[in-house]
Regions:
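Phosphate-binding site recognition
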Residues: 1-258, 262, 407-419
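A cross-kingdom feature that marks ATP-driven nucleic-acid transaction machinery
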Residues: 229-419
Length: 419
């Protein structure tokens, strides 16, 4: 390193940047400013100072400048927006997302069910994963890290929201309403006693901050304008916190953690994890497609639902391959018994009775997928082997891949070897 930089105190930012640019000028250097928003909070003029430094000193030097920040709204405002002094000077931007389940599972080396249940709590946020050791008792770790008043994640959503928005209580109420099962715009507004027009800006902000996501059926040609959109909590830990911590804050403040542990025992696997498993299955299918283990090129992977006079129709995983004119419909079962052919027959019936699907994808071949934690009955295995349109995935193994979905790269190894 530069010993002078270790000894000298600079009173002027430009002098510091000039020294960095002039240090071994023939060599490429990377200058990283971490937590840029907090620097701006302490010195509101810093974006203008940095603009001047870039234009006058760094732009034509051998320096790559990287600005990092965990506050999305402030990075947008002070580094990316049209009003920022730095506007127009970036060469690229990276918005880091949580790690996908498939990437984590491939390196963690723990049983599939443990990985799914841990991911349902932590998502793919590396900092959260530091507190959850693979293979350790998950409920004990939840108790220590999340339910304890001294736990690192006990107040995490409070810290995240208060750093990003004003009137955090209003946003908390919206997230709580969604956590309670209100997913349609009208139902969320009704639960809060708000007009939908007043609610929409709050929802947009929460989506921009990755707290929420708006999902639409894969049949929608213009998802942004769709009136069938449903709102969900996008972050696994935030969803967990609002389900198992926020409603019991009073009890937890009195060190009564047992009430939450009882709730976890009652429905964590059957309801909470089973819901997360649907997103994991979408990730698994996307990974199989990317690795070309499955000959399917999806333009979109999501879900499908329809409420009409014939009742409610829901399909957990749905993907469309416009190139080959094929549709994938999948059902996800996270329970302790093998999936029987009855599940396949019900899925097939859902697809066949949907006039909307036939209209949206005329002439498309339908491929069916069943994702199971606990395998399949012999009747289901026999059914798949005689068909060219059924994909079976048990935990981390592709048990059956129909010939129509195979290519030269198609194999039947554990999924962790496919990703």
């Amino acid at each position: 390193g530069n010993s002078m930089l270790q000894r000298v105190t600079f009173t002027d930012w430009l002098d510091l940047f000039r020294e960095i640019a002039n240090y071994r000028p023939e060599e490429k250097k990377v200058l990283v400013i971490d937590e840029f928003p907090y620097l701006v909070k302490t010195n509101a003029a810093f974006p203008s100072i940095l603009q001047n430094a870039w234009d006058e000193i760094l732009k034509d030097s051998n320096v790559m400048l990287i600005l990092c920040g965990s506050l999305i709204s402030m990075m947008q405002k002070h580094a990316l927006s049209h009003d920022s002094p730095l506007y127009g000077r970036r060469s690229a931007q990276i918005r880091l997302k949580p790690l996908p389940f498939t990437d984590l599972y491939a390196v963690q080396g723990q049983p599939f069910s443990h990985a799914v249940e841990q991911y349902s709590v932590t998502g793919g946020v590396p900092k959260y994963l530091e507190f959850f050791e693979p293979g350790e008792d998950l409920y004990r770790q939840i108790q220590e890290v999340v339910l304890s008043k001294n736990g690192f994640l006990y107040e995490e959503p409070n810290f995240l929201l208060k750093d990003e928005v004003q009137s955090a209580n209003s946003y908390f109420s919206i997230i709580r309403a969604i956590a309670d099962g209100n997913h349609k715009l009208g139902k969320i507004a009704g639960a809060l006693g708000m007009e939908t027009s007043s609610l929409t800006p709050y929802l947009s902000t929460l989506i921009d901050l990755d707290f929420l996501k708006k999902a639409t059926p894969v049949t929608e040609k213009n998802p942004e304008k769709s009136r069938k959109g449903l709102y969900f909590i996008s972050d696994n830990f935030i969803r967990f916190w609002f389900r198992y911590v926020y409603p019991y804050k009073g009890e937890l403040e009195l060190d009564n953690q047992q009430i939450v542990l009882d709730e976890l025992e009652k429905d964590f696997i059957q309801k909470f994890v089973a819901f997360s498993y649907e997103d994991i299955c979408k990730d698994i299918f996307a990974s199989l497609c990317r690795s070309k283990a499955v000959d399917f090129a999806p333009s979109r992977i999501g879900s499908y639902w329809l409420n009409d006079i014939n009742g409610d129709t829901e399909i957990d995983v749905m993907a469309v391959d416009h190139q080959k004119k094929q549709v994938f419909a999948g059902e996800c079962k996270y329970h302790n018994k093998p999936v029987d052919a009855t599940v396949y027959y019900e899925l097939e019936e859902k697809v066949k009775k949907s006039a909307e699907l036939r209209t949206a994808f005329p002439g498309y071949k339908v491929l069916y997928g069943l994702f199971s934690k606990s395998g399949f009955t012999q009747r289901m295995l026999d059914q798949a082997e005689g068909r060219d349109d059924i994909l079976l995935i048990q935990e981390d193994c592709v048990l059956w891949l129909p010939p129509s979905m195979r290519n030269s790269a198609s194999t039947f190894p554990p999924l962790s070897e496919c990703f």
